[in-house]
C-alpha cells in the first residue's frame, strides 16, 4: 500500500493556506482553490508544511489520507505554477482555432465542433494542429483534454486524430492482398 499521506505538502512562498473547519482554502498568484475535507482526515498547518493525518485506523480513513494529501499537493502546485496539457492534431484538413470563448475544431466531420472554454481555463492554438490547455485545477484540465481528444481519437492505421503530445500511437499494418 502506498504511503503518500506520510509526507507533508510544502507550501512555497506566495501561496497562503487557510484551514477553517472542514474546508481548506489555498490562494496563490493564479487564483484560489477550495477543498472540503472528509470527516475521517485531519489537516494541520505547521509553518510552510501541510500535514494530513487519519482520525482513526479504518480502511476508508487510510484511503482518504493519501487522497486528501494528493489533492492538497495538486492545489498548491496549481495556484502557484498551474497545469498544462498539450494536444496534437494529425490528419489532412484537421485543424483547431480559438474563437472568443470557444474552441472550433475541424475534424473531418460534415460540421465544425464548437467546444466552450470554461472561465478558469485558458486555451491557445499556436499552430492549427496544436492545442495547449492550461489552468490551476489538474482534474479540470485533464478532463477537458480528454473530452477534446474523444471527438476524434487517434486511429492505429494512419495515426489520424487528436492525441496527447507525449502519447505514442501503436501503429498497425494494413491488410495485405
UniProtKB/Swiss-Prot annotation:
Disulfide bonds: none annotated. The keyword Ribosomal protein applies. It holds the Pfam family Ribosomal_L6. GO terms for cellular component: cytosolic large ribosomal subunit. GO terms for molecular function: rRNA binding; structural constituent of ribosome. GO terms for biological process: cytoplasmic translation. This is Large ribosomal subunit protein uL6.
